[in-house]
Amino acid sequence: MKVLVIGSGGREHALAWKSAQDTSVEQVFVAPGNAGTAMEEKISNVPLNIDKFDSVKDFCIKKDIKLVIIGPEQPLVNGLADYLQNNGINAFGPSKYAAQLEGSKTFSKNFFIKHGIPTAQYASFSNFYDAVDHLKKIDYPTVVKADGLASGKGVIICDDQTQAEKALKSMFKEKAFGRAGNRVVIEDFLEGEEASFIAVVSKDKVLPLVTSQDHKPVGEGDIGLNTGGMGAYSPAPIVTQELNKKIMDEVMYPTVNGLIEEGHPYLGFLYAGLMIKDNEVKVLEFNCRFGDPETQPIMIRLKSSLVQLCLSALKDELDSHTIDWTDKHSCGVVIASNGYPEAYESNKEVSIQDYDDSDVKLFHAGTKIQDDKVVTSGGRVFCATALGTDLKDAQKKAYNLVDKINFEGAFCRKDIGYKGIK
């Protein structure tokens, strides 16, 4: 069997690496991939333009691809999954309609209210002056969000009206997030602890994966600008068994049943970004794909086949599928380029010291091979990921791996996993 993974980040390296471990898989293609996927056994990069759906379809037919796993959000929002499925190709990912849960904050907030899914109070605006006028009527802190896709960076927490006006100006006037900021959502600030809840969904069937917790802000202690994610760990102790059931009953099932009611049943990974306080849950956002960097610590804990899991969902056989996880804990630390999450440096040559430990794995993200050398090509460059007997052990191993990576301007957060170690 041949598998195609769409994307080029650390998430896609982890998905391709896991897919290649399946004995029924002879080859995994990654489009376009990165330096890490280029160096893996059974994995090949292909220079497909993933915005040209015809090219992806033709490649799948030519290579007899039996499963396409779509990693990033943009191709899903553009409708790649529908297009491939309509052409008889097994594409694992939601429809263009369902992907609006991530593609438009306004769509998702309206959906939450309509289907009784707990979330923060909000208002949506496509006019700068109307949005500024709204700022006079609300309490602070507040949260200003770009409506569209902004690589996880379009969320600004504002302590007062001045900061909120500045955020609106950056989105509407300065186009800091391009077209994603043509409409904004202003919502109540929620206090509590965040957790990532990711499940595999097929119509009304929801199979949760192990829990995880991301670290969005760029600085230690969760300060500074929001990023795509500076690291993650699994499991997240805040998500107890009781809370797990509450999330399924109050968030996941109402979401998938709501989409069925609207005539667009969900297929794919569904990721709920949650705020938890006093055992109550509210949805911050939905992502219609695996999180990055949560994928890396989750995939390293997965013992059973990712490919068979996706195929079971495509066949609507999730209710009879079981997932096998290691009891070990995992921790993934992102190594980023100087300047990230703003303008960052690239084309820095990377040196990687040898390591020999089956409990650790270096997933590449923003890397490419140039003149037979690995060089940086993105804001987030690697995710050093490790298994351990407990979180502290996994954290120690991950940071030991970080120490083996070197390039000019490299930095990471030194406290990934701190909330889970108390």
Identify the role of each PLM range.
Residues M39-E41, Q100-T106, G219-E220:
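Short, charged, surface-exposed secondary-structure boundary motifs
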Residues L4-V5, L101-V185, Q213, P237, ...:
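Active-site nucleotide/adenylate-binding loops and adjacent lid/helix of ATP-dependent enzymes
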Residues M248-L270, N287-D359, Q370:
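Active-site "cap" helix and flanking loop/linker of ATP-utilizing ligase/carboxylase catalytic domains
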Residues M1-Y97:
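ATP-binding N-terminal substructure of ATP-dependent carboxylate-amine bond-forming enzymes
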Residues C158-T295:
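Internal nucleotide-binding/catalytic subdomain
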Residues Q21, A38-M39, F92, K114-G116, ...:
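Solvent-exposed alpha-helices and their adjacent loops that cap or buttress functional pockets
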Residues T367-D371, T376-K422:
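Generic C-terminus detector
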